[in-house]
Amino acid sequence: MESAGIQQLLAAEREAQQIVNAARTAKMTRLKQAKEEAETEVAEHKTSTEQGFQRKLEATSGDSGANVKRLEQETDAKIEQLKNEATRISKDVVDMLLKNVTTVNN
């Protein structure tokens, strides 16, 4: 009788061990699946973020090129204006300098 009870306990222990092993295997499978899903989601988010960044970069760099061209045109116009102004007043400046240099004050 005792032998039958021991055999029954050993069988129950083996069954419990199989249940624990099955649960452990199922848990590991779920963890592996969750990790793969998380990695996929992270990769998708990274791709999406990178694409958004590239779109913004292209949009702003296009504006930057237009701004540079506009600034160059404005600078050239200002330089031309200053050259014209200098040419216009240079005779007056020379006359004023000659007058002040050649005039003696007592």
Swiss-Prot record:
GO function term, MF aspect, one: proton-transporting ATPase activity, rotational mechanism
Source species of the chain: Arabidopsis thaliana
KW Protease (keyword) present: no
Membrane topology classification: Peripheral membrane protein
Name of this protein: V-type proton ATPase subunit G2
Origin superkingdom: Eukaryota
PANTHER family on file: V-TYPE PROTON ATPASE SUBUNIT G2, VACUOLAR ATP SYNTHASE SUBUNIT G
Biased composition (Basic and acidic residues): 33-58
GO cellular component labels: cytosol; Golgi apparatus; plant-type vacuole; vacuolar proton-transporting V-type ATPase complex; vacuole
Region annotation Disordered: where it falls in the sequence: 31-67
Binding partners and assembly: V-ATPase is a heteromultimeric enzyme composed of a peripheral catalytic V1 complex (components A to H) attached to an integral membrane V0 proton pore complex (components: a, c, c'', d and e).
Pfam families listed in its UniProt record: V-ATPase_G
